[in-house]
Amino acid sequence: MTLINKLKQHLSDSQITQAQLAREAGVNAGALSAYLNDNYKGNIADVEAKLAAYLEKKAVQAREFVEAPAFIETATSRQIFKTLEFAQIANCLATVYGMSGVGKTKAIQEFAKSHANVWLVTASPSRSSLSEILYEIALELGISDAPRRKGTLSRLIARKIKGTEGLLIVDEADHLPYEALEELRIMQEEAGIGLVLVGNDKVYTRMKGGISPSHEYARLWSRVAKNTSIQKTKKADTQAVAQAWGLETDEEALKVMQSITETGGGLRILTQTYACRNGSKRIWQVD
């Protein structure tokens, strides 16, 4: 089969668009279209090398990797759902914090997808200042022409979310400075929505310092209605993942899975390990 026929077969089987294939292969979309129609006039050898490499990569992925389920409901995800539901219903401030790799982000993403008026933004080193996190929220709300002035932007967001009975979730909230947290707290109270800060232990420990009335976080701490700590992967989480992958009766696999989830990174490492299982029903042991 010629390379052109292989590419056409791949497009048909995978339902991928030509534009997406071109992006992933690193070739110009027009060049790909011309090549598939056998009338490309440019450097054919260069284009064919990139397209052949693309097909080889896809073959390796299909042979060596297994696509994990988009979402697996676990005991931990249900615990997080309860906190999110509470914050939205009670229009209050809550936190979800703890070890990385235990499923916090997957849970909040699933909740945001399946509930109305739930907005999820992610903070980062470059998106942690007050103006940047407000801009992220504006984009999440569909305000594409959002102004960059902090005061104007904050008032615009507050008007947009007021009366919605909604929920704002900020992932990686440990990146946010005091100024940004205070602004979100005031906005949450004025708009009458729920606000959940998600991240590592710093999300909680910083605000807990506010237990002292003289501490700068005192106003924040006094308004936190619920703190949910997740410090390790639950055994029930591992069992739920095993069941989703059809391994619940494989005692050897269950033991290895449990040992993996007991390390830092927990479910994330387990998912990556299973994805690389070489097409077999065997979990790799990780040193």
Swiss-Prot record:
Residues annotated as domain HTH cro/C1-type: 7-62
Binding site for ATP: 98-105
InterPro entries associated with the record: AAA_22, B_transposit_C_sf, B_transpositn_C, Cro/C1-type_HTH, ExeA_AAA_ATPase_DNA-bind, Lambda_DNA-bd_dom_sf, P-loop_NTPase
GO biological process entries: DNA integration; DNA replication; DNA transposition
Keyword Kinase attached: no
Gene Ontology terms, MF aspect: ATP binding; ATP hydrolysis activity; DNA binding
Family matches, as Pfam families: AAA_22, Phage-MuB_C
PROSITE patterns per record: HTH_CROC1
Keyword Transferase included in the entry's annotation: no
Keyword annotations: ATP-binding, DNA integration, DNA replication, DNA-binding, Nucleotide-binding, Transposition
DNA-binding region of this protein: 18-37
Matching PANTHER family: GENERAL SECRETION PATHWAY PROTEIN A-RELATED, MU-LIKE PROPHAGE FLUMU DNA TRANSPOSITION PROTEIN B
Function: This protein is a non-specific DNA-binding and ATP-hydrolyzing protein essential for bacteriophage integration and replication.
Name this polypeptide is given: Mu-like prophage FluMu DNA transposition protein B
Organism: Haemophilus influenzae (strain ATCC 51907 / DSM 11121 / KW20 / Rd)
Organism placement in taxonomy: Bacteria, Pseudomonadati, Pseudomonadota, Gammaproteobacteria, Pasteurellales
